Amino acid sequence: MKVLNNLLYTGDHEWVRVEDNKAYIGISDCAQRMLSDIVFVELPEVDDEIAKGETFATIESVKAASDSYMPVSGTIVEINEELEDNPAALNEDPYGSWIAAIEMSDKNELEELIKPEVYEKICEELDKEA
């Protein structure tokens, strides 16, 4: 299982990559492993204002449907339209296949996210339970 050191994570297995005031959001390798084969992604709309903790996307796999929760508040400025035609990209490259980019309204919310070394331990524990 892969955890990248240049990202921040949530307990719900989303990752955040920050570029200035923009944050790219996706699902972690741990999440895509739990979901198994992803068959559909319901993307948010550009210009949607989403608060931290709100659902911003729904991911359907052969196992289940799972909501993805926004790790930081702000306005959606970009969506990864490739996922409409190729949702399996989240399985193939979970860290290269972001779901949405958000213009953050409060960068201080980043401080509440999980550091890579801590997230890696969380995933290792989940692997042991599986």
Swiss-Prot record:
Alphabetical keyword list: Lipoyl
Modified residues (N6-lipoyllysine): K63
Required cofactor(s): (R)-lipoate
Gene3D superfamilies reported in the protein's UniProt record: 2.40.50.100
Biological process terms in GO annotation: glycine decarboxylation via glycine cleavage system
Cofactor, how bound (note): Binds 1 lipoyl cofactor covalently.
UniProt-listed PROSITE patterns: BIOTINYL_LIPOYL, LIPOYL
Chain ranges of the Lipoyl-binding domain: 22-103
CC terms in the record's Gene Ontology section: cytoplasm; glycine cleavage complex
InterPro entries for this protein: 2-oxoA_DH_lipoyl-BS, Biotin_lipoyl, GCV_H, GCV_H/Fam206, GCV_H_sub, Single_hybrid_motif
Family: Belongs to the GcvH family.
Oligomer status and interactors: The glycine cleavage system is composed of four proteins: P, T, L and H.
Described function: The glycine cleavage system catalyzes the degradation of glycine. The H protein shuttles the methylamine group of glycine from the P protein to the T protein.
Name of the molecule in the record: Glycine cleavage system H protein
